[in-house]
From Swiss-Prot:
It is a single-pass membrane protein. The active site is at residue 291. Pathway: Cofactor biosynthesis; ubiquinone biosynthesis [regulation]. GO terms for biological process: regulation of ubiquinone biosynthetic process; ubiquinone biosynthetic process. It comes from the Bacteria. Belongs to the ABC1 family. UbiB subfamily. Keywords: ATP-binding, Cell inner membrane, Cell membrane, Kinase, Membrane, Nucleotide-binding, Transferase, Transmembrane, Transmembrane helix, Ubiquinone biosynthesis. It is found in: Cell inner membrane. Residues 123-505 form the Protein kinase domain. This is Probable protein kinase UbiB. One of its GO terms (molecular function) is protein kinase activity. The chain crosses the membrane at residues 522-540.
Length: 544
């Protein structure tokens, strides 16, 4: 470890000690090195004893700087790991820092674009429109040299020298996380190293603005011509790893309820559309904006009777596969049907909990945690908290962490919070129910079978020529085996007809298994067709 890193580690540890964060260490025997380390810092005492632990942790992270602030923000969404009071304190962390010099921003942009800003833009504002720990944004207009002359744009630029700072602090986070499992069994359950790894990926992805560009383009295409959501246009010719240029939007922050009402916005429809946008992303597109907090969501001021969301900052997104979506849909439907056994089976069938899990105990654990939720009317039940309760129970049964579902649960909490802030009477279940039912019907109904046949048609055609040969070979093998069986039967006649029949059945079963094994790489319908043919032949021969 370098001297610089050692100094930073010392600063981190003493900051935590000054805020009394070491109280989370239980009264257990510490290692010799840990005891010596704490004694060496005997003079660093908790200077904020009058504050609750959650407040002290928030203040400590705030003091340590942007990388730790963003870690706290991420941890605030992991309500499967922390008490609600602690998560709520961490959610108060604000990723807002002083902007860096506008002239430096100009130099970075010009270096990325390969020329003077005046080549492409007019009215570049060196005063940042907004500033955060990773990047800041400036406004400008396309000049007469561009096809979109006069178009208002926003230029986002990564902070200079932020990457080495992030990587250095991440390395120290890994070192601290490696100590956590040694504290207690509860500390081991936090899987601190896994949390840091997840955070590292999220943070490093945010440093590459071309990812944000690609995500925004994909989301924009998914909602092209949609009345529900508008995503600003990206200008790929001007986008690089540390600089992107996008359309500037003008809207009302979704959290500014008074302005929305003053503008005549249909608040009920706006709240319902927020839920519809989320479930459309999840079940139709398998791709969702995973950072939908109030600062990233605006409402188009035009046509307030038909409100449209505007989404920005696509740096963090989530993707789902069919198994994820099936888990989500079936778990919600089973929960609202109070079918806790189905909920338990879903976790095992998905492979996220061990196959030898005690289903009865699993079901009972879900029942004990989820049943009290129904003391509320259905319209007041939070999907995000339902999912959180499912995660908490599943973790007790050794469920593997599913980062994509953690992202989804965080986003769902954002959507619910914004929806009920806009329209407190929002009925989430009635709004979401059609999406869940339609998706399940499409996956298991006649439509799903027809769609699967259509998708597999080229594969069917490719293997169809093999079908007659497969049947012929199976019949030839059966003919040869029958001859041998006849010889064997003569020998076994003295031992009774029943034994002969048993031998024929056993050998026929071996033939069937052999045929299935030989064609295990064929489509299901072709393998089944071959099997049915062989069974018919065997049946006819038995009758003869």
């Amino acid at each position: 470890m370098t001297c610089k890193n050692t100094r930073r580690l010392y600063q981190i540890i003493t900051t935590f000690l000054r805020y009394g964060i070491d109280e989370i260490i239980p009264d257990i025997p510490l290692t010799r090195h840990a005891r010596l380390g704490r004694k060496a810092l005997f003079w660093v005492r908790n200077q904020h004893k009058d504050q609750p632990f959650g407040v002290r942790l928030r203040l400590a992270l705030q003091e340590l700087g942007p990388v730790w602030i963003k870690l706290g923000q991420m941890l605030s969404t992991r309500r499967d790991l922390f008490e609600p009071e602690l998560a709520e304190q961490l959610a108060l962390l604000q990723d807002s820092v002083e902007p860096f010099d506008g002239k430096s921003a100009r130099q970075i942009i010009e270096q990325a674009l390969g020329g003077s800003l005046e080549t492409w833009f007019d009215e570049f504002d060196e005063q940042a429109l907004a500033s955060a720990s990773i990047a800041q944004v400036h406004t400008a207009k396309f000049n007469q040299n561009q096809p979109l002359v006069g178009k208002d744009v926003v230029i986002k630029v990564i902070r200079p020298d932020i990457e080495p700072i992030i990587k250095a602090d991440i390395a120290l986070m890994y070192r601290l996380a490696s100590w956590v499992p040694r504290l207690s069994n509860d500390a081991r359950r936090l899987r601190a190293t896994e949390v840091v790894r997840e955070y590292e990926k999220t943070l490093l992805d945010e440093l590459d603005l071309t990812r944000e560009m690609a995500n925004a383009i994909r989301l924009r295409n998914n909602f092209e011509n949609s009345e529900m959501l508008y995503v600003p246009e990206m200008y790929p010719d001007f986008c690089h790893k540390n600089v992107i240029v996008m359309e500037r939007i003008y809207g009302i922050l979704v959290s500014d309820v008074e302005t929305l009402k003053a503008n005549g916005t249909d608040m009920k429809l706006l709240a319902e559309r927020g839920v519809q946008v989320f479930f459309t992303q999840v079940f139709r597109d398998s791709f969702f904006h995973a950072d939908m907090h109030a600062g990233n969501i605006f409402v188009n001021p035009n046509h307030p009777e038909n409100p449209q969301y505007i989404g920005i900052d696509c740096g963090i997104v989530g993707t789902l596969n069919q198994n994820d979506k099936r888990y989500l849909a079936e778990s919600f439907v089973a929960f609202f049907n109070r079918d806790y056994r189905r909920v338990a089976l879903m976790h095992v069938e998905s492979g996220w909990t061990p196959a030898d899990t005690d289903i009865d105990a699993f079901e009972q654990a879900f029942r004990e945690v989820c049943e009290p939720i129904f003391a509320k009317p259905l319209s007041e039940i939070s999907f995000g908290h339902v999912l959180l309760n499912l995660f908490n129970v599943a973790r007790e049964f050794n469920m593997e962490v599913q980062p994509q579902l953690v992202l989804l649960q965080k986003t769902l909490l954002y959507i619910e919070g914004l929806g009920r802030q806009v329209y407190p009477q929002l009925d989430l279940w009635q709004t979401a129910k059609p999406f869940l039912q339609n998706w399940l019907n499409e996956q298991v109904g006649v439509k799903a079978i027809l769609r699967d046949l259509k998708q597999r048609a080229p594969q069917f055609r490719e293997h169809f020529a093999e079908f007659p040969e497969a049947v012929f070979n199976a019949l030839q093998q059966q003919k040869q085996i029958n001859f041998r069986l006849d010889e064997l039967n003569k020998t076994l006649q003295a031992q009774g007809r029943q034994k002969s029949h048993n031998v024929r059945s056993i050998v026929s079963g071996v033939i069937i298994l052999g045929v299935l094994w030989r064609f295990d790489d064929l489509p299901l319908w072709l393998s089944c067709g071959t099997l049915v043919t062989v069974l018919l032949v065997l049946l006819l021969q038995r009758k003869s």
